[in-house]
Amino acid sequence: MTSRYTNTRTESKNSILFATLSSIFGDKMNLARIKFFGLFICALCKVQTVCFEKLAVAFDTDAKVDSSLRRIQRFMAEYMLDNRLIARFVFSLLPHNPPYRLTMDRTNWKFGTSNINILVLAVVYQGVAFPILFKMMPKFGNSSMQERIELMEDFIELFGLQSIDCLLADREFVGDQWLGYLNRRNIRYHIRIKHNFWVNIPRNGHRVKASWLFNSLGIYQYAFHKGIVYVNGQLCYLSASKIKNKQGIPELQIIASFNKPDKAISLYKERWQIESAFKALKTSGFNIEDTHLTDIDRINKLLALVIFAFTWAYIAGVFLDSIRPIKVKKHGRRAKSIFKYGLTYLTSVLFSNDINKFTEICKFLSCT
């Protein structure tokens, strides 16, 4: 009786999940792939690792573990997953309205002699960033100007230029052609530059180091240069603050901006939110670095699935926090992150037989 009851419950839960995913992907993914997708993301939330053997054990199906494992391996090896499907899903669930502040950064790790290097474009939101689009880079080191432009153009094609408020990026993301592209596209940006960059000042013809414009700043002070300047041959505005780096040494944080340099420093601070997302994808969430995959196409599919699960968990956390707010400790920080709050709840529901709660968490996927 218990086994039959459990099987019935499992079938009901899967039916609810598959119906929800079908409403999201429509005719863009066949039913067999939708079923796999659902089983995989649920298993991922349960075991919180990308180890295929552990995921196969957590598949909520009557199939044997070896069969589930082969199913995972076939999906990674053969299926052509369209990243735009995942991007549209994440975009549809964003808990705030456009235009959005975007941030661009890289995440990388090493497995054996293989370097995994991924360029990510994300939407920042209250201490975290939602990865929207990403590009696997077949090399180690910084991204190229062309790779950045392709990622931005993909975003614009999917969601429109009007959905972008500004782009935030670190010192890696500079260069004359890159800034020129952003200027031509009228995309507002706040990008950190190196303090020793040469700056040309049109109003007097002077050529100075960027740091010279702000050498009077004291610790934790900030200022912006009132006139427009040339950096790498491109017109922009500059602002700066003097901060202490990780070693406690004072240094200038100089920001190049399309406009509104008076707001650059406060906006640039939001760039770090993508690091919270990377942490959730890695050690504090799904441990994507545990993968033994080295093939770019397979890692691409795995990352798309992990981003889907991350978004599900975070949206669940937003909902839970709205009805049972996370406690704030004496130092002013939350006792746990919104992401962890949501992931813990999803995991508990997925391990239970509560159909009502399962139906509730499926609604988070369709934003209903």
Whereabouts are the PLM-identified features?
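Active-site-proximal, Lys/Arg-enriched surface segment
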Residues: 65, 69-126
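Single, function-defining residue in the core of a domain
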Residues: 1-51, 61, 86-87, 97-100, ...
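TOPRIM metal-binding catalytic domain and adjacent DNA-binding surface shared by DnaG-type primases
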Residues: 42-46, 58-70, 75
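Short alpha-helical "recognition helix" segments of helix-turn-helix
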Residues: 55
